[in-house]
């Protein structure tokens, strides 16, 4: 009688991705309330740093409204090519664990971890290892990983 293989899937989500990249690339922005976005007064917030979220600012909010909530916010333009570059680095890390990776967006991916326990140990340990490796190869960016 064969034992049925436990299916495991990981949802990897980069934390405040655009804003975190801007703070990493521009140390003077670290610890400051950063809005990544553009489009003038009718533009929207593409990303909000953790420092600005405490003012009630969040992604998809009109920039004008965000600046009312936090007048001292620092607005930086979107650099999609840079975010895509970092995203590729993260996906490379995930693919070093499994060929079954599905990119959901520039800052999210799904990894099929079914059967990988034989190679990497318990999936919880594997998730912690991935988080450490992502942080290392990106120069300090963090991610959250959900398991199902």
Mark where each language-model region is:
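Gly/Gly-Pro- and Ser/Thr-rich, intrinsically disordered tail segments characteristic of DNA damage-repair
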Residues: 1-148
């Amino acid at each position: 009688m064969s034992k049925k293989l436990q299916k495991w899937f990981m949802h990897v989500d980069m934390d405040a991705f655009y804003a975190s990249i801007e703070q990493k690339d521009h140390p003077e922005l670290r610890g400051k309330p950063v809005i990544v976005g553009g489009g003038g007064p009718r533009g929207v917030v593409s990303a909000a740093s953790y420092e600005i979220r405490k003012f009630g600012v969040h992604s998809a909010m009109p920039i004008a409204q965000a600046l009312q909530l936090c007048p001292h916010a620092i607005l930086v333009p979107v650099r999609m090519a840079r975010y895509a570059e970092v995203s590729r680095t993260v996906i490379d890390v995930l693919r070093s664990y499994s060929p079954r990776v599905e990119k959901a967006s520039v800052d999210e991916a799904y990894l099929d971890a079914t059967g990988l326990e034989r190679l990497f140990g318990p999936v919880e340990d594997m998730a912690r290892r991935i988080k450490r490796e992502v942080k290392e190869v990106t120069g300090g960016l963090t991610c959250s990983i959900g398991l199902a």
